[in-house]
A protein has these predicted regions:
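Extracytoplasmic metal-acquisition and chelation regions
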Residues: 2-339
Length: 339
């Protein structure tokens, strides 16, 4: 074999080796890229909690919601097999709790996925002291909210709610309508995510701080609205916590909201009292659940319109294209518009 042939063979071997190594590198790069795209996942029962969780989790988790369709009732929701699988493979399952989405508790019990129950976390936070948790976030607004607003809500308004409604269902499971509760939830979520990814704990805390700062702006708007007269008829206790924080007075005849929420017709006496109240001129607005209706409710809405009483709609789910802050601001703006 002459020198020229040896050189040619050497070049071929070198080329083949280079192509082979390049292929390995390319394959490894693709695997790395594919791996980087596969983030840990969080599943939330509703798009409200998915949005709030996503704002805290940021780039390090993919967050999805089981329920985003406003025609779906979370109280009677049934998850598909695919959704059950997604929950079982998730790193965290965020549920509202408090009896609102009980289907989620059944789903969670069938998996090993850790559950973040907002209602239970808030109860534990109140027992431990909201100011302690807010202080951990390192944000001035969070501390103010935990100290000042918690006192207002717990001392002044909670007493009113307890006095007026007693043991009745007062909408306390609709905790996303309490700005203070949502602040505390964001802080607690940041702490939980920091446990799952300690290396990103500060990132989550910073995101929670930014979120709480935006909620603090809404609380200032809420505080300004609390000076207005707020006598209202509550066709559904959906936004009861928001109205309590505003210091508004619920004049709804006892038993109406409970019957409406349960899908039952109120008694003739309750209906007559409701009609008389709406026609009396005492109300600033009629509050209804935009996702539910009934012949009785439609008749009361018509009566309200004829009596010059504004009808304000409140929702259980985020409208498409809005985040939580924008959604709550729109609700406060709708209340401000009736002054």
């Amino acid at each position: 074999m002459n020198t020229k042939t040896l050189k040619t063979l050497g070049a071929i071997v070198a080329a083949v080796t280079a192509v082979s190594l390049s292929g390995c590198a390319s394959s490894a790069a693709e695997e790395t890229q594919s791996g980087s795209e596969s983030k840990p996942t969080i599943v939330a029962t509703t798009n409200v909690w998915a949005d709030i969780t996503g704002q805290v989790a940021g780039q390090f988790f993919d967050v999805t919601a089981l329920i985003s369709d406003t025609s779906v009732d979370p109280h009677s929701y049934e998850a598909s097999a695919r959704e059950q699988l997604a929950i079982s493979e998730a790193d965290l399952f965020v549920v509202n709790g408090g009896g609102y989405d009980d289907f989620a508790l059944t789903l969670a019990s069938a998996t090993e996925t850790e559950m973040f129950n907002v209602y239970d976390v808030l109860e534990a936070t109140e027992l431990e002291g909201g100011d302690e948790h807010a202080g951990e976030s390192g944000d001035e607004h969070a501390e103010e909210s935990a100290d000042e607003h918690a006192d207002e809500s717990s001392d002044e308004h909670a007493d009113e709610s307890a006095d007026e409604h007693g043991d009745e269902h007062d909408g306390s499971d609709h905790v996303w309508y309490s700005l203070h509760s949502v602040e505390q939830t964001a802080i607690s979520l940041a702490q939980k995510l920091g446990e799952l990814q300690p290396e990103n704990a500060q990132y989550f805390a910073d995101n929670a701080d930014a979120f709480v700062s935006e909620i603090a702006v809404l609380e200032q708007k809420l505080e300004a609205l609390s000076a207005m007269d707020g006598h209202y008829f509550e066709a559904h206790p959906l936004a009861a916590m928001l109205f309590a924080d505003l210091g508004f007075e619920n004049l709804t005849p006892e038993g109406y909201a409970e019957a409406e929420e349960a899908g039952l017709e109120p008694s003739a006496r309750i209906l007559a009292d409701s009609q008389a109240l709406i026609s009396s001129g005492q109300l600033q607005f009629l509050a209804v659940n935009a996702q539910g209706t009934s012949p009785v409710l439609e008749s009361l809405k018509k009566l309200a319109e004829e009596s010059g009483v504004p009808v304000l709609e409140f929702d259980e789910l985020l409208p498409e294209g809005s985040n939580y802050q924008e959604w709550m601001e729109s609700k406060l703006d709708s209340i401000a518009a009736i002054r």
